[in-house]
Amino acid sequence: IATCKQGDDWGLGKMQDFQNLSLSPAAGVINYGQGLFEGMKAQRAADGSVVLFRPEHNARRAQQGAKRLGMPPVPEEMFLDAVKQTVRENLRWVPPMGKGALYIRPLLMGGGPILGVAPAPEYTFLVFVSPVGPYFKGGITPTSLRVSDEFHRAAPGGSGGVKAIGNYAPGMIPSKMAKKEGYSEIIYLDAANHKYIEEVGAANFFCVKEGRISTPELTGTILPGITRSSIIELARSRGYEVKEEKVEVGYAMDADECFCVGTAAVVSSIGKIQHGDKVVEYCGGEVGSVTMQLYEELTAIQQLSLIHISEPTRLGMISYAVFCL
C-alpha cells in the first residue's frame, strides 16, 4: 500500500496484513467514485513455478485510466513490483495447476477528503489478493446470454474505456434480471444506435462467421481487455482473419459461433443468445471449434504448457515466473 499527495510523486509502498482501511466520509472515492481497479491472476505453471500473464499491460491500462479520472498514474515499475511482492508474500495461497488461481486486485483511489466535485488531495494505491477456484469446473461449457435493449453500459465521451469503479454498479441490476430469466449475463448494445454489440457484462465479445473473426472496435466505450488483445494476436498468428469493427447484433446472431473473453474465464463459449422474440443456438449447444482452439492455446501459454502451442515468444505473450519452486 502506498500514498501520494496531489502534485507529488508516489511514496514507497509497504507490505502489511489484509485489514480494513481508514477513510474520511468525505473521501473522493466514496463521494464521487474517483477510483479504478485492475484484475489479474497468478497461476501455478506446468513446471511448478508461479506465473503472471502480461502484467505490464495491466500497469499501462491503469495509467491511462488514472489520467482519465484525474489521478496520479502509478509508475509501471512500481505497479509491477507491488504485484510481484504481494504474490510472493501469498505463495501458499496459489492453488495447484488447474485447480484455480490467486486473483490479484490492484486498486487506485482518491482517499483524501474533498467536499467539492474536484480531484482528491491524496491518493492510495494498494494490491490485495484472494485464492479463487477454477472458473469452469469440469471443462469449458457454453453459456446463454440475453441482449438488452433497455440498459447501456457506456456512452461516447464517457468512461467506458477505462476500468473505473463507477462503471460496475449500474450493471448489477441488468445482470440480476438476466439471471432471473435463466441467462448467464447481458449483452450490451451501443447507446447511440442501439444495434451494435459492445460488451458482455464485464467481458469482451467475439463472433466467428465463415472462418472470419469479428470483435467490436475500441471507440472509447469498450474496455481494452488484455485477454481481448491476446486473443486477437493469437488468432491472427494462426491464420485467421480478425476484424475489429462495428458488430451488429443481427450479424452476431447469424454467426457460426460466438464467445467472450476476460481475465476470469479466459475464453467463454456462448451457446445461446436471446434478443427480443428471437433465440439463436450455436454449434448445437456445444463449444465451437475456433473457440476451443483459442481457449486451449491461450491457456497453454498462460500456464507454460508449451507442448500445446508453437512460437509463443514470437507473440510476446509468454508468462514469466515471479517465483520458481
Residue ranges and their predicted role:
Residues 311-313, 318-325:
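Positively charged, low-complexity/disordered segments
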Residues 95-99, 138-140:
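Short helix-terminating capping/connector loops at secondary-structure junctions
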